[in-house]
């Protein structure tokens, strides 16, 4: 009984990110199938995106600024056992009207959840047989305006980009592995060109204020 009471007390004192981590670790322990695992993670992320404390705290998160050819992500958490990472991505005034490079996330799974603001998510199909190096033919397959609470699952090697629409946008991104230490695919459709480069720089940040 004492153990149960202690567990209940600990659960009640959790903040939104701690609760997300606990539920995600439990899911990863129970579900080995990656597609099922990442689809089952959607409602857990939706709960995090709806948390008033997270929404309020995000107003103070620093803007992510590309530098030296690399994007920037805020790094809130990296799991020591399962390897998943919780990132933030804030796009302020400096990023308005810009399209992120068309890219894939290489071998990892990613859940992209919009926390605040609106932006367009554009996806592409790959048309060539991948036999030629530095070459790719892609075609736009969807163009969707997304807003707070909407979640996009990006599976390995799926091609996409995000486009700002004139307002500050904030996303919480869950990755199966922290980005930045491996190359990701980049696509230049006007030239049918493909190349690879490192993913986003990781800037450590607190999701929620301490105390």
Q: For each predicted feature, which ranges?
A:
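Long hydrophobic alpha-helical segments typical of transmembrane helices together
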Residues: 187-211
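Conserved short histidine dyad/triad with adjacent acidic residue
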Residues: 85-105, 145, 155-158
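Glycine- and acidic-residue-biased ligand/ion/polar-headgroup-sensing regions
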Residues: 107-125
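A short hydrophobic beta-strand segment most commonly corresponding to one strand
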Residues: 111-113, 166-183
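A short, N-terminal "cap"/entry segment at the start of jelly-roll beta-barrel domains
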Residues: 2-83
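Short acidic-glycine-tyrosine-enriched beta hairpin
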Residues: 111, 125-161, 199
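Short beta-strand His + acidic residue motifs that chelate non-heme Fe in jelly-roll/DSBH
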Residues: 100-103, 121-122, 154, 160-165, ...
